[in-house]
Amino acid sequence: MQAKAILRHTPTSPRKMRLLAGLVRGKPVDQAKAILLNSTKGASRNVMLTLKSAVANYAQLNPDERVSDQELVVKEVFVDQGATLKRMLPAPMGRAYRVRKRSNHLTVIVDKVKQSSK
């Protein structure tokens, strides 16, 4: 059974968050945590918190099952665009530039590693 965690209205550009989502997609949870800990990107903290939340949700959904981080895999990670705040920045000669403050919604889905039977 898979578990999911969603972080909404994160004040980061979706483009920047998708860079990190691509790094951890399909990886075991322990390996994904190591990647995020060593990342210099500012959004790595938000991805790490959401990943930990998804693992905790998996443990809560399966209370009789003891699983470690090596047994769980990041099945899906996707980033959707959130609300965009539009602001004005004063510009030369009485004009104004539009500043778009973007946000995103991060979804992380974890599942147990499927054992291949040969």
From Swiss-Prot:
GO terms for biological process: translation. GO terms for cellular component: cytosolic large ribosomal subunit. The keyword rRNA-binding applies. The keyword Ribosomal protein applies. One of its GO terms (molecular function) is rRNA binding. Keywords: Ribonucleoprotein, Ribosomal protein, RNA-binding, rRNA-binding. HAMAP family: Ribosomal_uL22_B (MF_01331_B). Belongs to the universal ribosomal protein uL22 family. NCBIfam families: rplV_bact. Part of the 50S ribosomal subunit. This is Large ribosomal subunit protein uL22. It comes from Chlorobium limicola (strain DSM 245 / NBRC 103803 / 6330). The gene is rplV.
